[in-house]
Amino acid sequence: MMELELRNVSYQYEKDTFSVQKVNWKLRSGEIHCWLGRSGSGKTTLLQLAAGLKRPTSGKVLHQDVPVEEPLSDIGFVFQDATLLQWKKVIDNILLPIQLKRKITEEDIAYAKALLKMLQIQHLFDRYPSTLSGGQKSRVAIARALITKPTLLFCDEPFAALDLMTKEELQNELLYLNQSKNIAMLFVTHDVSEAAFLADQIGVMEKGAFIYRQQAPDWSKVNSHRRDTPLFRDYCLEIRQSLEETAHA
């Protein structure tokens, strides 16, 4: 089982200025965690620390109980801007992380096509990014993040610029990927309903620390679509109230 841990982690940009303060956090295989908070609360910096993209000023980042000294190799990233290479076809954009490391094989191409099919965009494999919609570009970015078969997927505001219907479709697809492939996922988002729908655990950050953490309700007891239930609406309300408390702190 994969395990990623932040142990008493702090990060200091300048003297006496901490963007992350003494954070303890743990993510395991198959879990989805979402971090919420105002801009500048430390969410993205903490994600970079967890991924090994930054070194903590104090504390430890542990992957499989081993200190992280460099960027993690078994991790995929999805950002708000898909940053697809406009002169490369969809299939080539997806295969790019492999191409940067070694020669592409027929097995790699077959897996890329399988990801396209899973994300319902198999008909786009030979198209160029300029011909794609925002939702299609996001699906390509997800496939590219998964092509190396990572155990971790980190997403920083991946669907912020998309319309509600497309956003919910992609959330459904990521939830399916999480459950079918047992991938651990971390989301940084401002969208309360997105966090409530996806996350096993939600954390609200303020001034570089978690001021609220909450385990998700037991959705297995919900017979209908979870977004349509009173339990989901009440859960979103609870999270929003915690965010409002940070605004007045």
Could you say what each language-model-derived stretch is?
Residues 36-38:
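The feature captures the beta-strand-to-loop junction immediately N-terminal to the Walker
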Residues 51:
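Helix-to-loop junction immediately C-terminal to a conserved catalytic motif
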Residues 59-71:
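Conserved ABC transporter NBD signature motif
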Residues 106-124, 176:
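Conserved ABC ATPase "signature" region
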Residues 128-132, 136:
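Conserved ABC ATPase signature
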Residues 147-151:
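A short, proline-enriched helix->beta-strand linker immediately N-terminal to the Walker B motif
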Residues 153-156:
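Catalytic Walker B motif of ABC-type/P-loop ATPase nucleotide-binding domains
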